[in-house]
A protein has these predicted regions:
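Bacterial N-terminal signal peptides
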Residues: 10-20
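Mature extracytoplasmic/periplasmic domains
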Residues: 278-279, 283, 287-346
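A ligand-binding cleft/hinge motif common to bilobed small-molecule-binding domains
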Residues: 123-127, 245, 249-269
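Periplasmic-binding protein-like
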Residues: 159-161, 222-227, 233, 265-289, ...
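Extracytoplasmic ligand-binding site segments that recognize negatively charged/polar headgroups
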Residues: 63-79, 90-106, 112-248
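Short, polar/charged alpha-helical segment
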Residues: 47-57, 67-88
């Protein structure tokens, strides 16, 4: 990625955004062979991948949360994991936010329903490390140093660039200020609430950059959305694939891999990335330190960071997202070059 903000939600910023209107039965962790997977920090530490697979299969279940099947190819990823290991996946709140993920970790703590793993925005990851347990996947060295917590509390997984997706009926957008035109009345939406959803927050940050703001303050981004609202162009509807197909949200701020015509299912969908506001960002994986299925949680991470043709890294790539191990995969030849060639170009 050319650039990436490490964002933290300040209380003042969150309040400002709201003002704009953008708004028990657990596993013990032990397994055959004596490993306590609830505390193991690597597969090798617990006896290797064979032991991890056996322990995860014995648990038989994995709890995930906030993973929409159409988001970054997660539908295929979830199916591939179950097909490979025969482990049942319980998927909760598929359209939930990063903040809802950590809230579930807290409220479901000590129960069999607690999330085993999380996929959260960086602001939420950095603010909640006390909820995570360290684990380093087998391909740890292929994850850039700046994109992981040194002990393995979190590690970035996939990313992209913030973009504006829009119906071609509006013509061609060349600047965010074009969105202030009367023809965009009630059309411009975010993918969630920026006080809790990472994608929506980064949409505001992109506007902040385009308006000349700096990473240290989102005031200019908030001001832009105030102008959108004053013009009657901002829609409070949280954009989804369904709202895009229905024409309810014909202009959407979202990650480029979630703004592709193939993703939204609209053939006349166009994508605009402001060249004065190129904002890249990654999500991050983490394991709940109270995971009810600790071995399955670790096996899931191993699968996601696998560079095999049918592993998580190439499956994310097939969904239009940029996997965190992309550079290493290009070097060792494991990357799917066809899918890599489809990624939107950013200058």
């Amino acid at each position: 990625m050319r650039s990436s903000y490490r964002l933290a939600l300040a209380g003042v910023a969150a309040a400002a955004l709201l003002a704009v209107g953008c708004s028990s039965s657990g596993s013990s962790g032990s397994s055959s062979g004596g490993a306590n997977w609830a505390t193991e920090t690597s597969a090798s530490g617990g006896g290797g991948m064979t032991a991890l697979v056996a322990a995860a299969k014995k648990e038989g279940t994995l709890n995930v949360i906030a993973l929409p099947p159409t988001w970054a190819n997660y539908g295929a990823i979830l199916s591939a994991f179950t097909a490979k290991y025969g482990i049942k996946i319980n998927s909760a709140l598929p359209d939930g936010s990063s903040q809802q993920e950590v809230q579930a970790v807290k409220t479901e703590h000590g129960t069999a329903k607690a999330p085993d793993v999380l996929d959260v925005g960086m602001a939420v990851a950095l603010a909640n490390t006390t909820l995570f347990t360290p684990y380093q996947v087998s391909s740890w060295s292929d994850i850039p140093t700046a994109q992981k917590e040194p002990t393995g509390l979190w590690y970035q997984d996939y990313g992209g660039y913030m973009a504006v997706g829009y119906s071609s009926k509006f013509g061609t957008i060349t600047s965010l200020n074009d969105l202030l035109s009367p023809k965009f009345k009630g059309a411009v939406a975010l993918n969630g609430n920026p006080t809790s959803a990472n994608a929506a927050l980064n949409g505001v940050m992109m506007a902040n950059l385009a308006e000349g703001g700096s990473p240290g303050s989102i005031a200019d981004g908030v001001a832009f959305f105030k102008k959108l609202k004053a013009a009657g162009n901002f829609s409070p509807v949280q954009a989804t694939g369904a709202t895009i197909k229905a024409g309810t949200t014909p202009v959407v701020f979202n990650w480029d891999y979630l703004n592709l015509p193939s993703y939204v299912g609209v053939s006349n969908w166009k994508v605009f990335i402001p060249q004065n506001a190129v904002l890249g960002g990654y999500y991050a994986q983490a394991i709940n330190k109270g995971a009810p299925h600790p071995a399955a949680a670790r096996l899931w991470e191993e699968f996601l960071y696998s560079q095999a043709a049918s592993g998580g890294q190439n499956l994310w790539l097939a969904g239009g997202a940029r996997p965190v191990e992309q550079a290493a995969m290009q070097t060792n030849g494991s990357i799917n070059t066809t899918d890599a060639g489809k990624l939107p170009s950013v200058s």
